[in-house]
Regions:
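Phosphate-interacting basic helix/loop segments used at nucleotide- and nucleic-acid interfaces
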Residues: 219-232
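Flexible, charged surface loops at secondary-structure boundaries
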Residues: 136-138, 232-235
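Conserved G1/Walker A P-loop phosphate-binding module
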Residues: 2-197, 201-207
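Short amphipathic alpha-helical segments and helix-helix/interface helices
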Residues: 133, 226-229, 253-254
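Canonical P-loop GTPase G-domain recognition
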Residues: 5, 22-25, 168-207, 214-220, ...
Length: 287
C-alpha cells in the first residue's frame, strides 16, 4: 500500500469515528499519524527531480502571492494592479513561471507575485505544485483568486496549502518543547486544556520524543499540538478575491456571496472594483 492509500485509509477512519470524550485520544493519534504521512508525501515530492524550482528575490515592504486554479484571472489582475507583463490566456497553465509586479499604494511598496495555478494534488507535487508552494511559504500575504463560477476551489486550495504545512489566518500555538536526556515527558500549562496530558505524551512519542518538558500557554487542540511538535509550519494571513463577476447573473453572484461574504468581488478584465483590492491587500498587510 502506498502513502496516498495510507492517507485515505486514515482519513476514512477519522471520518467514521464519532468524536466524543471516549474517542478523542484515538482520533488524536490518528491525526498524528495522518500528519506524518502527509509530511512524508511533501518530502517525497520535494526530493524528486524534474524542475529547478522558482527563485524569487523578495523586494519592497511586503510580498503578496496570488493563489488560484489555472485561468481564474490572476495574470489579468496582476497586470491591472501593477502593469507587470504576465501572459494572459483563457486556457490552463498560461503562467509557467513566477511573474513579479510592484504595487505602490499609500506610501507602501508591495511586491505581488503571479504563480502558476494550483490544482488538487499540488502538495504532493502535481502541476508544479512543489515549486509554487515554496513561493507561497515565503510570502507575507496569500490572496486567493476564485472564479465566480467555481468558488468551490477555495476549499481545495486551502486544503492543499494545509497539507503542505501552511496555516492561514492562524497564529502559531504558544507551545515550548524542551528536549531532555532523561525523565520522560512532563507537561505544564497556564490554563485548562482541551487535550489531555496522556494525548500530549502519546503524540510526542509518535514523533520519537520520549524525554522532554512541554509548556503550553494556549488552549490548543490536537492539530495545533502536532503543528508545534513538527515545527515546520508557516503562518500567513490570507484574503479572498472573487473574479469574473461581470459574467455572472444575479443568482450565481448571490449564491457566491452567501458562501464567501467576506470576499472582495471584482472583474479584473473590466477593471471593476480594483481599488477595493488594493485596500484589501494594504489592510491585510497591517502596515
Amino acid at each position: 500500500m502506498g502513502l496516498h492509500e495510507d492517507i485515505q485509509e486514515v482519513e476514512e477512519e477519522i471520518r467514521k469515528t464519532p468524536y466524543n470524550k471516549a474517542t478523542s485520544h484515538h482520533i488524536g493519534r490518528l491525526k498524528s499519524k495522518l500528519a506524518r504521512l502527509r509530511d512524508e508525501v511533501v518530502k517525497k515530492a520535494s526530493s524528486k527531480g524534474g524542475g529547478e524550482g522558482y527563485s524569487v528575490r523578495k523586494s519592497g515592504d511586503a510580498t503578496v502571492t496570488l493563489v488560484g486554479f489555472p485561468s481564474v484571472g490572476k495574470s489579468t489582475l496582476l497586470n491591472k494592479l501593477t502593469g507587470a507583463e504576465s501572459e494572459v490566456g483563457a486556457y490552463e497553465f498560461t503562467t509557467l513561471d513566477v511573474i513579479p509586479g510592484v504595487l505602490e499604494y499609500n506610501n507602501a511598496t508591495i511586491q505581488i507575485l503571479d504563480v502558476p495555478g494550483l490544482v488538487k494534488g499540488a502538495a504532493s507535487g502535481r502541476g508544479r505544485g512543489r515549486e509554487v508552494i515554496s513561493v507561497v511559504r515565503n510570502c507575507d500575504l496569500v490572496v486567493f483568486i476564485l472564479d465566480v463560477f467555481q468558488n468551490y476551489h477555495h476549499e481545495v486550495l486551502t486544503q492543499e496549502l494545509y497539507d503542505a504545512g501552511i496555516r492561514l489566518n492562524q497564529k502559531s500555538p504558544d507551545v515550548v518543547i524542551k528536549r531532555q536526556d532523561r525523565g520522560g515527558i512532563t507537561v505544564s500549562s497556564t490554563m485548562d486544556l482541551e487535550i489531555s496530558e496522556d494525548l500530549v505524551k502519546a503524540v510526542l512519542n509518535d514523533y520519537k520524543i520520549h524525554n522532554a518538558h512541554v509548556l503550553i500557554r494556549d488552549n490548543i487542540n490536537v492539530d495545533q499540538l502536532i503543528d508545534a511538535v513538527m515545527g515546520n509550519r508557516v503562518y500567513i494571513p490570507a484574503v479572498t478575491v472573487v473574479n469574473k463577476v461581470d459574467m455572472a447573473d444575479e443568482f450565481v453572484l448571490k449564491k457566491c456571496k452567501e458562501g464567501y461574504p467576506e470576499a472582495t468581488y471584482i472583474s479584473a478584465d473590466k477593471e471593476q472594483n480594483l481599488e477595493a483590492v488594493k485596500d484589501l491587500i494594504y489592510d491585510a498587510l497591517d502596515f
